[in-house]
C-alpha cells in the first residue's frame, strides 16, 4: 500500500496498516514526509511539487512522519520518483509527480533528522521492505554526512530538461562518496 495514497485521514490509514495482517505494509515518499499541500502554492504555483496523491494537510503529513519514523517494520521507503520533462510539468495540464531520485536518501535523512529519528532511517530504507518480501538485505552500504549542498536547477533529460525537487535549494545531507 502507498500510505499517502489511502483516502482520508493519514492517521487512520497508518492504524489500518499497523493492525492488518503481517503481509500488509506501506511505502511512504520523502516528499510526503517533508511537505504539506502549502508547498505547491508558496510564492505562486510550484508545479514541481504537484504529485498524486496530492500533498496532504499538515496534520496528515505529521501522521505520515510518525508512521515512517516509528521503527515499525510495516512502513518502508518508496521513492515514487517521477521524472517528467519540465515542459510537461509547467503547463495547464501538467503531469503529476516529483522527481526525487537525485537526492532520495538526502531527503529522507532530512525528514528523519527533523523527527529526531535518524537511528530508524536504516530500517525504513534498507531492512523493512526486504524483510516483508523475504529478500536478503543488500550487502552494500552508503554513508550520509551532514553537509549542505544545492541540487542543480535542472538535469538533461533527452531533448528536454528535468527539474528536480528542491532544485536550487540547499539540502542538509549528502550521500558520501
Cite the ranges covered by each PLM segment.
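Residue-level detector of alpha-helical segments with a strong bias toward transmembrane helices
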Residues: 37, 88-90, 144
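His/Asp/Glu-enriched, well-ordered alpha-helical/loop segment
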Residues: 70-137
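A general secondary-structure junction signal
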Residues: 7, 80-81, 146
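Short amphipathic alpha-helical segments with coiled-coil-like heptad repeat character
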Residues: 13, 134-141
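Histidine/acidic residue-rich metal-binding segments in metalloenzymes
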Residues: 1-77
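C-terminal cap of metal-dependent C-N hydrolases
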Residues: 139-177
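Short, glycine-/Ser/Thr-/acidic-enriched flexible segments
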Residues: 31, 82-84, 149
Amino acid at each position: 500500500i502507498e500510505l499517502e495514497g489511502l483516502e482520508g485521514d493519514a492517521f487512520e490509514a497508518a492504524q489500518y496498516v499497523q493492525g492488518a495482517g503481517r503481509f500488509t505494509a506501506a511505502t511512504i515518499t520523502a516528499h510526503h514526509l517533508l511537505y504539506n499541500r502549502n508547498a505547491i502554492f508558496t510564492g505562486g504555483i510550484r508545479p514541481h511539487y504537484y504529485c498524486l496523491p496530492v500533498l496532504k494537510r499538515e496534520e496528515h503529513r505529521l501522521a505520515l512522519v510518525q508512521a515512517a519514523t516509528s521503527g515499525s517494520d510495516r512502513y518502508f521507503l518508496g521513492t515514487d520518483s517521477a521524472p517528467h520533462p519540465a515542459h510537461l510539468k509547467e503547463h495547464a495540464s501538467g503531469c503529476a509527480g516529483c522527481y526525487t531520485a537525485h537526492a532520495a536518501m538526502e531527503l529522507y535523512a532530512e525528514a528523519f533528522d527533523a523527527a529526531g529519528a535518524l537511528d530508524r532511517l536504516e530500517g525504513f530504507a534498507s531492512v523493512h521492505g526486504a524483510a516483508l518480501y523475504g529478500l536478503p538485505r543488500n550487502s552494500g552500504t552508503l554513508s550520509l554526512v551532514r553537509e549542505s549542498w544545492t541540487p542543480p536547477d535542472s538535469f538533461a533529460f533527452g531533448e528536454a530538461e528535468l527539474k528536480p525537487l528542491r532544485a536550487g535549494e540547499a539540502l542538509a545531507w549528502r550521500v558520501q562518496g
